[in-house]
Amino acid sequence: MAVGKNKRLTKGGKKGAKKKVVDPFSKKDWYDVKAPAMFNIRNIGKTLVTRTQGTKIASDGLKGRVFEVSLADLQNDEVAFRKFKLITEDVQGKNCLTNFHGMDLTRDKMFSMVKKWQTMIEAHVDVKTTDGYLLRLFCVGFTKKRNNQIRKTSYAQHQQVRQIRKKMMEIMTGEFQTNDLKEVVNKLIPDSIGKDIEKACQSIYPLHDVYVRKVKMLKKPKFELGKLMELHGEGGGAGKPSGDEAGAKVERADGYEPPVQESV
């Protein structure tokens, strides 16, 4: 019999000794997710993060997290087919302050609108808001039968499709270019732009089911805490000295040394 080490036996202890199981949730904390003041329901849920440990700070793990929330949950509404994306930009205490990050229609709504015997018209445009956010907007609309129409199909001619697409782009650019992000979100909640496009295109070809189907965030300006606090309705003067609190610069000669005090 060959004499040698038994490699199967682990060093110092029984073979296959069990590791102590540590519950991963014992090292984590719950944080509240707060939606901006444009929405009726501000507290949209909770999120988990590992506690601050050494150089790994908990708030850094939360910043940049994106939450997709149905408009029904944000507005306390029963019927809503739009989903809003909210991104965590700052953490205050146990609250994650979020900002608008995008919008989308639900899949079932999008699929329910696509039918036979009609023309689907899509348009997209890049718009910069007054406060420096660059958004890409996607719009969709469908042709419908005229009131006295007998024919089964309602297809628009290529020239009409181009005219409608041009109108869509003009209206979206005009509506969003002159507003800041807060006003843009306020317009997206009821989707008033879809109704405006429907009215404007009535003379070219009657439309129905016109929606801004998607909003993508392409570029953001540099993060400012004051602006985020304004969005959350908590005032913009966070961390700034007000009026009398602002200090004045004291002029001192070069090589100045304070006098030695006799008693402290």
UniProtKB/Swiss-Prot annotation:
Coiled coil: none annotated. GO terms for biological process: translation. GO terms for molecular function: structural constituent of ribosome. The keyword Cytoplasm applies. It is found in: Cytoplasm. Residues 233-264 are annotated as: Disordered. The keyword Transmembrane helix does not apply. One of its GO terms (cellular component) is cytosolic small ribosomal subunit. InterPro entries: Ribosomal_eS1 (IPR001593), Ribosomal_eS1_CS (IPR018281), Ribosomal_eS1_euk (IPR027500). Keywords: Cytoplasm, Ribonucleoprotein, Ribosomal protein. Residues 242-255 have a biased composition (Basic and acidic residues). Its main location: cytoplasm. HAMAP family: Ribosomal_eS1_euk. Belongs to the eukaryotic ribosomal protein eS1 family. Component of the small ribosomal subunit. Mature ribosomes consist of a small (40S) and a large (60S) subunit. The 40S subunit contains about 33 different proteins and 1 molecule of RNA (18S). The 60S subunit contains about 49 different proteins and 3 molecules of RNA (25S, 5.8S and 5S). This is Small ribosomal subunit protein eS1. The lineage of its organism: Eukaryota, Sar, Alveolata, Apicomplexa, Conoidasida.
